[in-house]
């Protein structure tokens, strides 16, 4: 299939323009989390994307969803509502980290990179864990219940940077505290709500493109059960399981 071909070519040529060194031992991938916010206030659903800084070593100038590396302290942040049980169960498969950590990372990174708040207003008596001071100062609490786990992807071996990324989707109207516009920052610029068709025309990492396809499937067939894909690569090519 076209997708198989695309994912296999990713393995041979690194997207960030860095030469793939075959002989070196592979780094263990670092846990990461990404949030795809979906708005449905127009005829076509739109997703929030931004352009990575050109100075980034990893995927410069590519359009991506907000997200980043899991900080172990993220799991300690307080939540208004926890993940739904079925979402939590899927995140536990072949994973040692507490599921809420991924959701909290996705929410923290979205806040840091776009200024948008997936949460509720509530005064918290306790001190915030590192990385959550600003949330705490604004009397905000993350809300995990709107997040749906839609996929997981591990960067191919022999890369200078490797991630084991969990992708979440959330309905903007339910998840966001208000309708403020996203604000460009150091990590992401040209932040915009784009239709899936327009998003596909942007310069995207192939895993981002793959997950946009998953979003399209979920939005087109809301009543069906959608099992999150788990993409990973080996020397013989890539494998896609469904969790």
In which residue ranges do the predicted regions lie?
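N-terminal leader/linker segments that precede catalytic domains of diphosphate-processing enzymes
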Residues: 2-243
């Amino acid at each position: 299939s076209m997708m198989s071909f695309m994912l296999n070519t990713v393995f041979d040529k690194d997207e960030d323009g860095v030469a793939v060194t075959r002989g070196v031992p592979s780094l263990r991938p670092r846990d990461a989390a990404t949030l795809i916010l979906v708005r449905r206030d127009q005829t076509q659903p739109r997703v929030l994307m931004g352009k990575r800084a050109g100075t980034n070593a990893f995927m410069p100038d590519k359009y991506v969803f907000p997200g980043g590396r899991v900080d172990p302290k993220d799991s300690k942040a307080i939540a208004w509502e926890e993940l739904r049980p079925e979402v939590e169960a899927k995140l536990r498969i072949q994973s040692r980290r507490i599921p809420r950590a991924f959701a909290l990372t996705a929410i923290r990174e979205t806040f840091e990179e776009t200024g948008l708040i997936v949460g509720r207003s509530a005064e918290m008596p306790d001190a915030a864990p590192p990385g959550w001071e600003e949330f705490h100062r604004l009397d905000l609490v993350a809300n995990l219940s709107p997040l749906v786990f839609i996929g997981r992807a591990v960067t191919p071996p022999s890369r200078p940077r490797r991630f084991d990324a969990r992708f979440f989707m959330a309905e903007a109207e339910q998840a966001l505290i208000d309708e403020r516009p996203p604000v460009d920052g150091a990590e992401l610029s040209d932040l915009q709500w784009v239709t899936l068709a327009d998003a596909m025309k942007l310069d995207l990492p192939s895993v981002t493109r793959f997950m946009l396809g998953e979003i399209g499937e979920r939005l087109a067939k809301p009543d069906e059960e959608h099992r999150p894909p788990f993409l990973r690569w080996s020397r013989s090519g890539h494998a896609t399981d469904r969790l």
